[in-house]
Amino acid sequence: MQAPPSFYEGDTLEVAKKLLGQKLVHIVDGIKRSGIIVEVEAYKGPDDKAAHSYGGRRTDRTEVMFGAPGHAYVYLIYGMYHCFNVITAPVGTPQGVLIRALEPVDGIAEIKLARYNKTEITKAQYKNLTNGPGKLCRALGITLKERGVSLQNDTLHIELVPKEEHISSQYKITAGPRINIDYAEEAVHYPWRFYYEGHPFVSKK
């Protein structure tokens, strides 16, 4: 079942941890592409210097962060890599969770084509399919078109994984500093990156 609106409400750090083990789904040309979320980062504007919304900064790009929880915030880095975030916290509190890595599940052939333009790939390439925010967006076909989209729809959503199938029993959740935020002064050290320790698709050990 799809995660209901209430799933995205509450403390952003708790929502981040709840997202681990759930499935990110995107339907592209009628074909389901998905992956189990294995790594996330929480961003808690306006006080978090690593957040795009630090200081209440409100731009065309960040406007969706000030909206209702349970919407997609997609942006570009280096002018070419998309990053997918889930908006959390009440309206007016610009916070969200970056999805950093997935374990691919559905639409593997389409994911391989999206990443490598071929379906015959090496084991190393397979592990590289979705082990980073830009990689997973390319794999699942997530672009700026999805910015601001409600996750209460059939095309793009979070699918809750039944307890008996959830991988949380196999991996320990570990917290640590977020990645590539050297500009963020004291926020560099906040342990707001959560991931399954030892999972092969985690972007950075």
UniProtKB/Swiss-Prot annotation:
> Keywords, A to Z?
DNA damage, DNA repair, Hydrolase
Q: What class of enzyme is it?
A: hydrolase
Q: Which residues form the signal peptide?
A: none
Query: What is any one GO biological process for this UniProt entry?
Result: base-excision repair
Parts of the chain that traverse the membrane = none
Q: Name one GO molecular function term.
A: alkylbase DNA N-glycosylase activity
Similarity section: Belongs to the DNA glycosylase MPG family.
Q: Which NCBIfam families match?
A: 3mg, PRK00802.1-1, PRK00802.1-3
Name this polypeptide is given: Putative 3-methyladenine DNA glycosylase
Organism whose genome encodes this protein: Bacillus cereus (strain B4264)
